[in-house]
Amino acid sequence: DVQLFLEEKADDNIFNMVDAIVVGNRKLAFKLIEDQRRLGQEDGYLFSMIVRQFRILISMRDLFNREENISSDSMAKALELHPFVVKKSLPLIKRFSLDKLKDIYKQLLDLDIKTKTGLADQSWLIDLFVGKLG
């Protein structure tokens, strides 16, 4: 029962962690990253969730740029995303231009390459990314 509670807590907090990163709340993001690590989450998983959120934001921003008056339900259907994900992410896309989101995604790609080629530790690179983004 305790293990199940910890898994649910980790799942809830992973989304809060990603949101804190996206909105640039470094203090909260670092705290939630450490919480995730303490709960046993691997940096690879944390990284994949960060990448996933920025990929969603890029898709949404691109569609929003092409169809400014699109409803959130239509956007969810067009992008094959759950309506809750779209509604939760909609305010976030207004914080970034498509070019800015692409730049952030390129930074994430560079981080992934450095990790996979052994140039730097993924944990350190995630922390650096969060620090620079905020």
Named regions from a protein language model:
Residues 2-100:
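Small-residue-rich helix-loop
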Residues 102-134:
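C-terminal terminal-structure detector
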